[in-house]
Amino acid sequence: TDYISKFEEEIIDAIEGNKNVKDSLLNYLQVFKYPNVERVTYDRNEQIYKNQIVPYMGKLIVSNITGADIKRLISTLTDKGYSFSTVKQTYNLLNEYFDYLMREEFIKKNPMNAVPTIKKSNYLAKQNKEVLPVCETITVFTDEEIEKFKAEAHKKYPSGKPKHNQAAAYILMLNTGLRTAEALGLINSDIDLEKKVMHIQRGVKEAQKRDGTERKSGREIIVGKLKTASSKRIVPLNETAIQAIIELRNERYFGEDAPLIPDADGNFTRPLNLRKRFYSILDAAGIEKKGLHSLRHTFATKLVTGVRAEDGTVKALTPRQVADLLGHTTSEITEMYYVKRNTDMLMGVTNGFEL
């Protein structure tokens, strides 16, 4: 009798719908997500699982979960002040998970059907935050900050040694709009100084060290594909960018097949180290802390809004041209981030349209 009872319990436990969310969702991540997504993406999914889902829903039985349970989770995360991005990713992971359970017929009803898609405007309103156009949420350098940053980046000790290691990398990023992963992924043979171009072909990211799906201590560098297909592109080099490349090679050069921005051993540099050195320059220059991506935003904003020449003319690029330079999939993305509404240009345009 005990044997039969134990056997029946094992059968019940083996049914996915009878498991708790903690065990079932972890199994889904390890079996279905890990083999099919980038390591960095898996790390993020795992963090969402551990920090945003398990503490609040981990003990619930899968087949008993209702839309109300998930709405309650979203509401809790909102009240705790989590960013829209974090809560949206939580929603997306749960949506994928319950869709999988439905396809495999582990549950009879999908609770996500009762949970509306999260809208950013509604989410921010609930947190009493102002809803701003995307172009007003990005951080860029002012002209004064650019000059202060460049002055600090070029400083040297009396011995002639640069004060900041590989500071020319930031000048290169400021003049090309490269993403951090793209800049670190450059190898010397990607660059043609005669033609004044560089070929963006790979990216460098950091991920959790693992033995299969099992986490190990520390982080490791992942050299792999770019963010999107359009990220693979040819980027023109202005004279400032060319000089930055020459400075980087004078500081460290390990050959044509080595990274342009190598570590001391000639290997790819960790993104974390590049960020730390960037913050060090900002601090020394007395500039308010900004993300490294601000260099890209500044470059793109300058291209769209234009640069005024000495004769008063303004040189600017179209959103389509900027999109191609940045590796955006569409020019709509470029417009959303970098084209600001100019209501002054609307003055008088309705004259003659009296109805």
At which residue positions do the language-model features occur?
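C-terminal catalytic core of tyrosine-transesterase DNA break-rejoin enzymes
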Residues: 103, 168-182, 273-280, 296-329, ...
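Conserved tyrosine-mediated DNA breakage-rejoining catalytic core shared by Y-recombinases
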Residues: 117-120, 186-247
